[in-house]
Amino acid sequence: MRSPGGILLQALPRLLQHAALPGLAELPARWALPRGAGGDGPADRLPRGGGASAAAAAAAASGALLGAYLERHGPPEASELPEPGGALAGGPGSGGGGVVVGVAEVRNWRCCCLGSTCWCRSLVLVCVLAALCFASLALVRRYLHHLLLWVESLDSLLGVLLFVVGFIVVSFPCGWGYIVLNVAAGYLYGFVLGMGLMMVGVLIGTFIAHVVCKRLLTAWVAARIQSSEKLSAVIRVVEGGSGLKVVALARLTPIPFGLQNAVFSITDLSLPNYLMASSVGLLPTQLLNSYLGTTLRTMEDVIAEQSVSGYFVFCLQIIISIGLMFYVVHRAQVELNAAIVACEMELKSSLVKGNQPNTSGSSFYNKRTLTFSGGGINVV
């Protein structure tokens, strides 16, 4: 990354050239000389010749500024200087836009902590999710307390049926509350029984949502997917040779559970393979959510605020669970993006060679048009 000093050295001569000195095209090249190569001071590196008094004053001011910078920081590195004849030097191909490039570089200079791969973002996101979880619990704890007490007072079979109905509802595109049901199942029935209830309920809900969306909502889902580049990319990869792997990885991403069921319903994956891949992909988050539910221990300790130590352990376990879940989701996103890129390259190579891409006979794929935009493949 270029330092602010190097960027200043690049932008200053061009700014002066546009402001007062139209004949300073060779200025950056002369400044690029090391100390002592073209003279003993910055004044020897300035162009000699005529010019108005205002131009001479501007040149003297720029030379003094550069001399002070060089005396304090030393000569700039070669990587910080413009290429001979480049955009900032006003050479061929500059097109008069050198100053715009320099100013853009100055504006775009920022701390590396704002990068997408910085661990600071992960830490901040984990803290925000934990705070939202605690805030939600504080806001709805009274209603949640009564609801959990009511479910716990029901007959065991009736409670299980209620959870299954809940999983069926959240399996549709407009449903919400999948994670809440997972945590509630682990809280009420424990880790083992809660896991079993989750797996059975999710399997039934996924099956029903898949069949209903495939037979009744295909046109609606296809219209929504065509407006989303991310979902279209997932569909393209699913219709390739690694469809089951992509289904399993997509289950670990933040894409809503019901929306994923609708997206996968318009593909040509066989129903048994689809259900198996979905079950495998959902297993890690189900384990984490069930464990998170069991850490609530009892309603009296956490909801009624009767145990300070219980709150401390609960907060620590929630932070660890959310951090682990974030790591799993991040790794799944990396793998899914890699699979999407590989599929894009395969499709692009097939189109360049004049071959028909492998679409597994998908009817949805035949309704779309592949176009080249910016060197990539977009779905329109």
Curated annotation (Swiss-Prot):
Bilayer topology term: Multi-pass membrane protein
This protein's record includes keyword Oxidoreductase: no
Main location: membrane
Chain residue ranges for the region called VTT domain: 186-296
UniProt KW keywords: Endoplasmic reticulum, Membrane, Transmembrane, Transmembrane helix
Record function comment: Positively regulates TNFSF11-induced osteoclast differentiation. Acts as a regulator of TNFSF11-mediated Ca(2+) signaling pathways via its interaction with SERCA2 which is critical for the TNFSF11-induced CREB1 activation and mitochondrial ROS generation necessary for proper osteoclast generation. Association between TMEM64 and SERCA2 in the ER leads to cytosolic Ca (2+) spiking for activation of NFATC1 and production of mitochondrial ROS, thereby triggering Ca (2+) signaling cascades that promote osteoclast differentiation and activation.
This protein's name: Transmembrane protein 64
Upper taxonomic lineage: Eukaryota, Metazoa, Chordata, Craniata, Vertebrata
Gene name as annotated: TMEM64
